From Swiss-Prot:
Database matches in SUPFAM superfamilies: E6 C-terminal domain-like (SSF161229)
Function: Plays a major role in the induction and maintenance of cellular transformation. E6 associates with host UBE3A/E6-AP ubiquitin-protein ligase and modulates its activity. Sequesters tumor suppressor TP53 in the host cytoplasm and modulates its activity by interacting with host EP300 that results in the reduction of TP53 acetylation and activation. In turn, apoptosis induced by DNA damage is inhibited. E6 also protects host keratinocytes from apoptosis by mediating the degradation of host BAK1. May also inhibit host immune response.
Family to which this protein belongs: Belongs to the papillomaviridae E6 protein family.
Protein name from the UniProt record: Protein E6
Keyword Transcription: yes
Any single GO CC term annotated in Swiss-Prot or TrEMBL for this entry: host cell cytoplasm
Name of the gene: E6
Miscellaneous comment as given in the Swiss-Prot or TrEMBL entry: Belongs to the low risk human alphapapillomavirus family. The cancer-causing human papillomavirus E6 protein has a unique carboxy terminal PDZ domain containing substrate but low risk E6s do not possess this domain.
Subunit structure: Forms homodimers. Interacts with ubiquitin-protein ligase UBE3A/E6-AP; this interaction stimulates UBE3A ubiquitin activity. Interacts with host TP53 and EP300; this interaction inhibits TP53 activity.
Molecular function GO terms recorded: DNA binding; zinc ion binding
Biological processes annotated in GO: DNA-templated transcription; regulation of DNA-templated transcription; symbiont-mediated perturbation of host apoptosis; symbiont-mediated perturbation of host ubiquitin-like protein modification; symbiont-mediated suppression of host innate immune response; symbiont-mediated suppression of host type I interferon-mediated signaling pathway
Keyword Transcription assigned: yes
Keywords: Activator, DNA-binding, Early protein, Host cytoplasm, Host nucleus, Host-virus interaction, Inhibition of host innate immune response by virus, Metal-binding, Modulation of host cell apoptosis by virus, Transcription, Transcription regulation, Viral immunoevasion, Zinc, Zinc-finger
ZnF unnamed: positions: 29-65, 102-138
Length: 148
């Protein structure tokens, strides 16, 4: 989603290049233009999302819009679903070497989350040409149970 060569792609680089400390950084949401709160900025960093550049200005995404956009993208651009073994056969690559994000919050899945998909025979979803799954937080939120 990051557009603009020569511009910092993530919040860490943006802070470094602009000389603005993280605590003082102010970004607007690219979708709703609301200013991101400090926890939303931190979550944006943890999710390893790219800064979006419009007319030379950097934008992030608030938690509400990330969730909404994830649901919208899944409904509009879902292609098909496969078990882990099917994804690995299709891509000729282990899921552990692939960047697979949560389709709800967009966080990259870690090994434990990928293992959970494999061990519990949960499907991964091809959405907009990318493989997506559920992180432990969204998994528990959707299933109404604790993540462990």
């Amino acid at each position: 989603m990051s557009r603009g060569d020569g511009y910092p792609k993530n919040i860490f680089l943006l802070c470094r290049d602009s000389g603005v400390p993280f605590e003082d950084l102010r970004l607007q949401c690219v979708f709703c233009t609301k200013e991101l709160t400090s926890p939303e900025l931190a979550a944006f960093c943890i999710r390893e999302l790219n800064v979006v550049w419009k007319s030379g200005a950097p934008y992030g995404a608030c938690a509400r819009c990330l969730l909404f956009e994830g649901i919208k993208r899944r409904l509009k651009y879902w292609q098909y679903s496969c078990f882990v073994e099917g994804v690995e056969a299709e891509t000729n690559e282990s899921i552990y070497t692939q960047l697979i994000r949560c389709y709800m919050c967009h966080k990259p899945l870690v090994r434990e989350e990928k293992d959970k998909h494999r061990n519990e025979k949960r499907r991964l979803h091809k959405i907009s040409g990318y493989w997506r799954g559920s992180c432990l937080y969204c998994w528990s939120r959707c299933m109404g149970q604790s993540p462990r």
